[in-house]
């Protein structure tokens, strides 16, 4: 969604300030290429991070246990957890 809104914004700016249709096409093409390259770099960084995490079997076990916990199941217990934590304090 971010890419689409960025492209539309650039298209509007290009239409306002461009001298010709070719300038508009070139500007949009450059922005799309830059956005694609940025996304690929982010994905590459994420893949590198995931490769490091996968090598540790204990990390996977904790991550798997954390995924099983659903936020909706935990939310009703949050006030009780806070009260239990604060009971020993003055």
Curated annotation (Swiss-Prot):
Q: Indicate yes or no for the key word Signal.
A: yes
- Quick check: keyword Transmembrane helix in the entry? no
Judging by the UniProt lineage, the source's domain of life is Eukaryota
List GO terms (cellular component aspect): extracellular region
**Signal peptide span per the entry?**
1-18
What does the UniProt keyword field contain? Amidation, Antibiotic, Antimicrobial, Immunity, Innate immunity, Membrane, Secreted, Signal, Target cell membrane, Target membrane
Q: What is its main location?
A: secreted
Point out the coiled-coil segments of this chain: none
Question: Which residues are propeptide?
Answer: 19-59
The subcellular location is: Secreted; Target cell membrane
What family is it from? Answer: Belongs to the arminin family.
Q: What does this protein do?
A: Antimicrobial peptide with a broad-spectrum antimicrobial activity. Keeps its antibacterial activity under a wide range of salt concentrations that mimic physiological conditions of human blood, which is surprising, since Hydra is an obligate freshwater animal with nearly no salt tolerance. Does not affect red blood cells.
User: Can you say what this protein is called?
Assistant: Arminin 7722
The species is Hydra vulgaris
């Amino acid at each position: 969604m971010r890419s689409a809104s960025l492209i539309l914004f650039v298209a509007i700016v290009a239409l306002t300030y461009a001298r010709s249709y070719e300038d508009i096409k070139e500007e949009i093409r450059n922005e799309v290429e830059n956005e694609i390259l940025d996304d690929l770099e982010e994905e590459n960084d994420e893949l590198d991070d995931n490769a490091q995490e996968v090598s540790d079997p204990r990390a996977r076990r904790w991550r798997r246990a954390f995924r099983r916990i659903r936020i909706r199941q935990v939310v009703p217990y949050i006030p009780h957890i806070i009260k239990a934590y604060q009971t020993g304090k003055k």
